[in-house]
Amino acid sequence: MPTLPSPASPSSPPSAASSLPTSPASAADNQPHQRRDIAESFGGDAERYDRARPRYPDALMARIVAASPGPEVLDVGCGTGIAARQLTAAGCRVLGVEPDARMAELARRLDTGVAVDVARFEEWEPGERQFDAVVSGTAWHWIDPVAGAAKAAGVLRPRGLLSVFWNVALLPADLTGAVADACERVMPDSPFDFRAALTRPAAVPYRAILDKTADGIRTADGFGGTEQWRYDWEFTYTRAAWLDVMPTQGAFTRLPAEELAEVLEAAGSAIDARGGSITMPYATMAITAKRK
């Protein structure tokens, strides 16, 4: 399993990199939170998801802990508990909210200190519970940006922290091209715009999601100004390790086995041409705000 090092001194990723659409950010409707079929598909292989998905930079976790007025954290769309476990290790007490019962069950099993309520965040009933921080790791795009921000404001204590963040893999153009070619062959009707990913500037990955998130926070009117944090780092994957990551991405979670195998073979061949491994630049990007 790729265990990620803490990014000690971030450096800018190569300008040739592209961001593969691992969520429906480039879908025609640009409303990923309405795609419940994709949002709740990750539990089909929850153990692979937890094994293969990258962790978040230690520096980001430390900054969240430092900015939070206390240790009580709500993790929205917690999945298998990747960010939740990192935060509990940093001394926080974490409650997760997760719409997929399969993901929630694994999160509880992997860390008995993490409780998880199964619900869509917009419909979740918090009762009298309040929190010092609300976080969301690579999941906020599945939540209505205005309703989600309003819900977060409602459960945060005064000056509580909202921090939502994404790990964005900046794939080299040769790998992205090989994957896009295969995807267009096997998924001609996909809502994901794979070809557009080839020309998306690496300097602004997930820009539409980040802008929509910030706009939602402003519209909800429960927070002060937003800040954007960014951490650049890289990790070297073997061929097998990267092919373990790919089926956990939203573009591929519902793909039939035969079509998925064709996409993975294309990616594997591109990695083989690079000598059997690939050093993947990542940008971990966060939008944060303090409750009024």
Residue ranges of model-derived segments:
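Conserved class I S-adenosyl-L-methionine
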Residues: 2-5, 22-68, 70-77
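Class I SAM-dependent methyltransferase SAM/SAH-binding core
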Residues: 80-124
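A short acidic, Gly/Pro-enriched loop at the edge of an enzyme's catalytic core
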Residues: 124-134
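A short SAM/SAH-binding and catalytic strip from SAM-dependent methyltransferases
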Residues: 133-146
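A short glycine-rich, Lys/Arg-flanked "PGG" loop and its adjoining helix->strand segment in the class I
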Residues: 148-158
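Conserved catalytic/acceptor-binding region of the Class I
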Residues: 157-232
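Conserved Class I S-adenosyl-L-methionine
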Residues: 203-292
